[in-house]
Amino acid sequence: MNIKQYLDSTYLKTASQAGLSEADNTIVAEKFIQEAIEECFKLIMIRPDIVSIAKKKITDANSNLQIGTVIDFPEGKSSVDEKISEAIQAIEDGADDLDFVCNYEAFKNGSIDLVKDEVLKCTLLGLENNKVVKWIIEVAALNDKQIIQLSALIKNVVISNFKEELYQSVFVKSSTGFYKTEGDLPNGATIPSIIMMLENASPLPVKAAGGVRSYKEAVEMIRLGVKRIGTSVAKAIADGQNSQIDY
């Protein structure tokens, strides 16, 4: 198993979240990009404002590293038009993967048609531009029934509107890694949540993000059936190490 080809090395902190100046935070992001190039990871996952920087570094290095970015991050509450506008800019800047935060609060409040509409329109935009689309459902904000239902909703929109050969380009993704939970509850991928996603999103692939911090945990997720793992400690995982960093 080449675990590096499952890893989306991730740095999504804003400067304020990192306690850094904008310039210093960009330097940190650039270090993640350089590491991902050197380690031959599948993808580097970064904020939209860093995509063009990553594109230049990857092109200059003649690397096959893919670029992913997040759309409407981390709450997913923007309108469909706002999501699309942000995604178009990311595409123009050189993103390969578009990780949209689903409007999970609207889903929880019963606005099912709104969610179906954004999944359809944003997925269409991505696929028309030959991009990989991922839908972040934020499992820590959902109960088990909601995880099952939202995974199935995304699946049903995709299989009802797109050709079968495109299914592998639309993922259901567990988490932003930034959701605030009560106490010490996990805010990312857990084994139970991933199993529910796999069972109800299939044939769409699943990405586990947040909470996977060791080689052992990554292998366990892969054996369950996940196709991608988002983590800020990709090198430590690839080296078979453990880490205590939250995302």
Indicate residue ranges for each PLM-predicted region.
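Alpha/beta catalytic cores of nucleotide-metabolism and tRNA/nucleoside-modifying enzymes
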Residues: 1-31, 124, 196-204, 212-247
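Conserved N-terminal beta1-alpha1 strand-loop-helix module at the mouth
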Residues: 1-80, 92, 153
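Hydrophobic faces of well-ordered beta-strands that scaffold small-molecule active sites
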Residues: 2-14, 44-46, 65-72, 98-100, ...
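Glycine-rich phosphate-binding active-site loops on the catalytic face of alpha/beta enzymes
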Residues: 11, 69-71, 92-107, 158-184, ...
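Glycine-rich, proline-tolerant flexible connector loops at the mouths of alpha/beta enzymes
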Residues: 33-53, 57, 98-116, 138, ...
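Alpha-helix-loop-beta-strand connector modules within alpha/beta enzyme cores
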Residues: 48, 52-73, 112-134, 141, ...
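Glycine-rich anion/phosphate-binding loops
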Residues: 74-89, 109-120
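Catalytic cores of alpha/beta
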Residues: 78-92, 142-153, 196-204, 212-228
